[in-house]
Amino acid sequence: LRLGAYQILYLDRVPDSAAVNTSVELAKISGRGQASGLVNAVLRKIAQNKTALPPIPERDEAKYLSIRYSHPKWLVKRLLSILGREEAEAFLAANNDTPPLTVQVNPLKTNAESLIKELEGWGVKATPHPWVPGCLELTGAGDLTTLAPFREGKLLVQDPAARLVSLIAGVQPGQKVLDLCAAPGGKSFSAAFAMEDKGEIVSCDLHKNKLKRIQEGAARLDLTSITPSAGDGRVFRPEWAERFDTVLVDAPCSGLGIIRKKPDVRYKKADDLFTLPVIQTALLDNAAQYVAPGGVLVYSTCTILPEENEQVTDAFLTEHSDFCRD
């Protein structure tokens, strides 16, 4: 009943009749054939009156939002405590949308205006991103990897928020940059664009098998400033001590800020998140040792939980008086 009602009320591409028929068949398949008549009658009634249904009582706010937007109740309660009702509901609704495909222009090969025209020639509509410079939103791209602009390295598929990391870092040509949790390489590539591929970027990741993707991406984009390196970002490497002008720590996290990109993230258990701040703190503490005097340390995640963001950086600043928040 709940699956069918959801399809009828919230999914535009599923005809009401299909939602009813499928739900009836599911009732029969699940061994509840005696309930199929009830399922049929209730769902048909909902379909006939879906514009005049009374509002659902919200005696349990978190439970209501959990059902309405298909998120676990523990997460909804946490979001309500962080964001408040209005912003939390907007966040939950956005998580059920399909994110636009966003690419960053490779300024070493082309510019936004030229790339927009070239993509249009391939039947792809491209528009400048509304708030991230150097990025485009694409419509009708299909398999982007088959298009010449992709194969020729004129663009990088990247979420706009990831692009912000290199902008915030303010990297400059000729600098030395360490990307401590680099795979699959997007932030390293973005930094190389900003540095005009001049300088040194060490792209480190714990998983050696992921370095191949960084190498392949750098080759496609014709970037020569990037050197992949395998290693645990929590383990000190003396040869890197105070060596880098900028160190990027895009720490492993719960991923609760990218649910619409990775819908399965919403089904993580609350207990799974407890160890993450320990890992994040260890990465940040170790990364601090690699920053040259006067350098920049950037900490980023793709989550909205304070335990993984503000609380980690606040604790770090308490222990490292030689750093300050910019």
Where are the language model's segments positioned?
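S-adenosylmethionine
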Residues: 1-326
